[in-house]
Amino acid sequence: MTSHLPYRIDLAGTWIDQPYVSRYGAGWALTVSIEPTIEFMERGGMSTSTRNAAKKIWPYELPNYNEEMMARLLFCFENDPERDGHISGAQDAIGICMSGLNRHFYDNHFWPERIESYHDEETLSWLESHLCLVEMFPRRKGCSVVAGMDITPEKVRALTSAADRCWQAIMERDLNGFAAAFSDSFNAQIAMFPAMMAEGVEEHISRWKPQSLAHKMSGAGGGGYLVLVIDGPVPEGAIPVKIRRKDSF
């Protein structure tokens, strides 16, 4: 039986869910929960490791239950600092379990101080009509996206400012503002984590740049999927996005 568990797309503020980033400045991460219209590849920035952990609790679909509670449960289930020493960012569990558009505020802790959910149908329809995904390649074994990281207060401010502007542009359905903030958020990410731009990524970006207003890599980068902001039909070869609505069980 096929699993109907959602995936997530991180729109802006990626990496702020790690305390070693938010210690330099608090801010929001923005995610949307998306329907599993295809089975996305592993090591592709689509939170498949967190989704695989979720399958151990809910093999086929999420229960009709408090979404934030499920996200907290999944986050705690996946992460064992005594054993692993590495904590997956909370944005993955939140992005999978919490429907619609969400932003979560991080301030030097693994779990956000607060979460805001948005379910306006016209806005979600607008947002998904301007997003699509394109496949690149799985993040290669041995690839460390944190190698050479350079985190400074100024770079974190650039990230958090972009996330603030991205949210506001979505609320106003301002496509150009959304694309600009989306791009600024990605640029802030790679300024702190240059190893996200693994060999071969730039070629894919160059290929799709003429067909998009903005782009970013999903998740931690190093490969995976490009998320494109578009103005018009989904380009041939790209994957449409379907945002999961509340109570769509």
Model-derived features: positions:
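C-terminal nucleotide
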Residues: M1-A12, I16-R23, G27-N52, W58-I87, ...
